[in-house]
């Protein structure tokens, strides 16, 4: 907390109290290390759009949760109901993942060429003053 306090011009106890309050209110939901997928053997990323078959939309999240290579899955508007981000060891691995989703719907896949805006934290804004 001392380093964080130095960065934001607050004492370590003040930072500790604020962090604890943010944890308790659900602003901070957890802590995680940022791992480079390439460094651990997953050099390929892909975005898979899934259009569920009739009466199958509830099964897409089940397939996504049971597929370890799926690192994100979002329900979206538009022609496709879900978008999943996957990390792959090889292109051969993609076929198996797509086969799992094919049971519940149609897929369209895009291979990620680069990430000009990598994952980043949201900007923090000050709370509006009451008055």
Q: How should these model regions be labeled?
A:
Residues 1-131:
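A compositional/biophysical signature of low hydrophobicity enriched in polar/charged and small residues
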